[in-house]
Design a protein with these regions (language model features):
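Phosphate-binding/switch region of NTP-binding enzymes
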Residues: 170-253
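P-loop NTPase motor core
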Residues: 119-205
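Conserved RecA-like P-loop NTPase ATPase core
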Residues: 33, 49, 89, 104, ...
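Conserved nucleotide-binding/hydrolysis micro-motifs of P-loop NTPases
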Residues: 81-84, 110-115, 139-141, 184-188, ...
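Conserved P-loop
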Residues: 42-121
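Detector for small/aliphatic-rich hydrophobic stretches
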Residues: 1-77
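Short, surface-exposed amphipathic charged segments that create phosphate/polyanion-binding patches used
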Residues: 115-125, 224-229
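Conserved acidic residues
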Residues: 102, 131, 208
Length: 253
């Protein structure tokens, strides 16, 4: 499979069922978020989830993975950070881990070159029976490459943009949603500081939905902000609680 060596690819499903064309939404499992997206992530969309460490961005992506697999559709999960946890997947699967795992295909690139190879062939990998693609995180290996390659940030940024274009095209052609997660960096203004996704302009340009996962004073409660995009005219704020079983809606009232 391109330049990805076999030891970096863990395939736990070889079920070719062409059902993806009938799938329109992949729910997150969080009612507030799903209602704000009319049921979940739409087929044909590229979606960005970003936030600091421990804000549930990977958990949200894995919940979508579980919900897709339980519909009998395969998920391509590209684990760029090497943090995919079968134990965490089991916790989110509500006693149906074997059923879920059967439909999860895991690819684990070890550097930005291998991530590029995955992006180049992503349409081939998802040709039949897939309902979702997750890339977690799309900026980890990019950030590492920028740090080690002096003076080549522009070229790497352009390559990341090309990867996002490939993923967006795959999503539209295959009519399935794609989710990318991103690390963040600090943005310091005159009155307050905030965070933004790494390679902000590239990621936000391609994203149909953008969800910012923000910590609160209660470390178990996360503020999920669905940001304005060309396809979303109003910002929506939801609160979710991080539990062992996943992210759940919570009320602050």
């Amino acid at each position: 499979m391109s330049r990805i060596s076999a030891k970096h690819i863990i395939s736990v499903a070889f079920i070719f069922v062409d059902m993806a064309a009938n799938l329109t939404k992949i729910p997150t499992g969080c009612r507030c978020i799903d209602e704000s997206m009319a049921g979940g992530f739409s087929g044909g969309s590229l979606n960005l989830i970003y936030g600091e460490a421990e804000t549930g961005k990977s958990t949200l992506a894995m919940q979508c993975t579980v919900n897709c697999a339980l519909q009998g559709l395969k998920v391509l999960f590209v684990d760029c950070d090497g943090t995919f946890s079968p134990k965490r997947l089991e916790q989110l699967s509500s006693g149906r881990f074997d059923e879920v795992a059967e439909f999860v295909i895991l690819i684990r690139p070890v550097d930005f070159r291998e991530q590029t190879a995955v992006a180049d062939r992503i349409s081939e990998y998802t040709a039949k029976g897939f309902g979702l693609v997750v890339i977690d995180t799309i900026t980890g290996l990019y950030r590492a490459k920028v740090a080690e390659t002096s003076g080549k940030a522009f070229g790497l940024n352009r390559e990341l943009n090309r990867q996002m274009a490939n993923i967006a095209q795959m999503a539209k052609v295959q009519k399935i949603p794609a989710i990318v997660t991103s690390q963040v960096y600090g943005v310091f203004g005159e009155t307050e500081s905030s965070v933004a996704p790494v390679a902000t302009r590239v990621l936000k340009f391609w994203a149909d939905e953008i969800i910012a996962m923000k910590p609160t004073e209660d470390f178990q409660i996360i503020k999920a902000v669905l940001e304005e995009t060309p396809k979303r005219t109003n910002e929506v704020t939801c609160y979710v609680r991080i539990r062992e079983s996943g992210l759940q809606d919570c009320s602050l009232q």
